[in-house]
Amino acid sequence: MANSGCKDVTGPDEESFLYFAYGSNLLTERIHLRNPSAAFFCVARLQDFKLDFGNSQGKTSQTWHGGIATIFQSPGDEVWGVVWKMNKSNLNSLDEQEGVKSGMYVVIEVKVATQEGKEITCRSYLMTNYESAPPSPQYKKIICMGAKENGLPLEYQEKLKAIEPNDYTGKVSEEIEDIIKKGETQTL
């Protein structure tokens, strides 16, 4: 079932932070693999940015076998995503998942607008030094599943579905394959 609107009007406190996800962490089950405290906060829009996929430092992701999501400034464009309220105890695991220590991504602060028009400040990530590359079919599927699960605007979901993946036909990690299989059986 799709989420809608902000679920928690209190926002972050000294024990928590808000994280704007636009890639594989759109999907609840995916973010909970490493960050169990993540709780849906709301759907939001990042104005004047565009979604892209790439290989950090020209190296293909060994996890996803294709380009992975990033954002870049692009006046007039927008990126939709999910804001998660997370316990600060998950900061290190989130940074680790995003490859901050290896220099794959940098932490950025973004101002996003909720569907109700409220502006909130969130933590997010931006890939540095990357070459554009299409995502694997599995990575694209996880992103599309998350967009649908959380009720991102239908027009944006269609844009995500229209992304051309690479031709990787192998497997990704077992835990991700399990999530994809569950998603496919739920839509039958």
Curated annotation (Swiss-Prot):
GO cellular component, one term: cytosol
SUPFAM superfamilies, alphabetized: Gamma-glutamyl cyclotransferase-like (SSF110857)
Coiled coil: none
Taxonomic lineage from the root: Eukaryota, Metazoa, Chordata, Craniata, Vertebrata
Modified residues (Phosphoserine): S173
Annotated catalytic residues: E98
Chain positions recorded as substrate binding sites: Y19, F20, A21, Y22, G23, S24, Y139
Superkingdom assignment: Eukaryota
Induction: By geranylgeraniol.
Key words of the record: Lyase, Phosphoprotein
Quaternary structure (record): Homodimer.
GO biological process: release of cytochrome c from mitochondria
PANTHER family from the UniProt entry: GAMMA-GLUTAMYLCYCLOTRANSFERASE
EC code(s) of this entry: 4.3.2.9
Molecular function via GO: gamma-glutamylcyclotransferase activity; protein homodimerization activity
Enzyme class: lyase
Designated name of the protein: Gamma-glutamylcyclotransferase
Family: Belongs to the gamma-glutamylcyclotransferase family.
